[in-house]
Amino acid sequence: MKRNLVTLALALGIAVLLFFVLRLEKQRAAGANCRLVYWNIQNGMWDGQNDNYDRFVAWVREKQPDICVWAEAQSIYYTDSDRPMRPDEQYLVAHWSELAARYGHPYVYIGGQRDDFPQAITSTHPIDNIDRIIGNGADSVVLHGCGWAQIKFRGKRLNIVTLHLAPHQWAPGLPSDEARKASAERCEGDKYRRMEIQYICEHTVATHPEAGDEYWMMMGDFNSRSRADNAFYRYPDNDTKLYVHDYIASQTPYLDALLEKHPGEMHVTMHYPARLDYVYMTRPLLERTVECRVCHDFYTEPVRDPQQLSNFWRPSDHRPIVVDFKL
């Protein structure tokens, strides 16, 4: 009897703790009046296709964001399957306006698209396209595209750059396993991402000489590691895996929001111990950032697909990042 009471008390204690944790997750940081949610929703929120995205919509509504940025924003595979959809059967990107309206966002923007992995922005405020970037089609191809949009919020113009850098250890477009292996040994995937980030920055933030005094943010799945986390990774100082974020740190006015808000901490954004997702900001916007955190809750915790389909996870192989601003 005594053991049962102890077990019951422990269970109640855990339930109360989880209640307050989840309640805190829903609330904005004190003083914040604008919330951004960024998330790579793997394969166009494939996990949400079997319930008409009801759980996804409910989660977004709970967070009450003003701006959302979604990476991998296109439907690709049939429900509970790894069979590619026919283009005419893909719900997203064509119906993002319909889906976003369900969580209270009447405005939708799709960035530059050249394959099945574009990024989308949805918002409570109008979104203006500045540029959709896919590269020059020759020596500089931005594999998954990039978007540069502006949103005016409380009289402040926010520049938002969305991206999703190339995913593999090898360079894109190679025809055989042998060629890909040789490319990976030459670290050509890292070098390709370094080319992409330079091209993106040169065509966005670098076009504004005064960007360091403006409100800019750049976010997405960078598929690369940061030197700021290298106490955790322990890569050699000259490792090519660090190229992308070294470029951002040395050549742009951007600052790593998670690092600035939580110095010295490692914030995992994947289903394995790594941070591939980042939100970068210029100093003026960072100074108006009340909180930036990786979201951990029941819904967003990555769970391997029970069928072991490809590399599919539910609801995604990435975790969201939530940012609260006082604008």
Q: What are these model-derived regions, one by one?
A:
Residues 35-41, 59-86, 122, 149, ...:
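Active-site beta-strand/loop signature of hydrolases that rely on acidic residues for catalysis
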Residues 7, 132-133, 206-217, 223-327:
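Metal-dependent phosphoester-hydrolase catalytic domains
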Residues 170-191:
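A solvent-exposed, charged loop/short amphipathic helix patch at secondary-structure junctions
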Residues 45-46, 76-79, 116-120, 168-171, ...:
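Short catalytic/ligand-binding loop motif for oxyanion handling, primarily in non-cytosolic enzymes
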Residues 33-46, 133, 157-167, 182-186:
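Active-site-proximal beta-strand elements of phosphoester/diester hydrolases
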Residues 48-55, 88-92, 141-144, 185-201, ...:
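Soluble or luminal CAZymes and related metallo-dependent hydrolases
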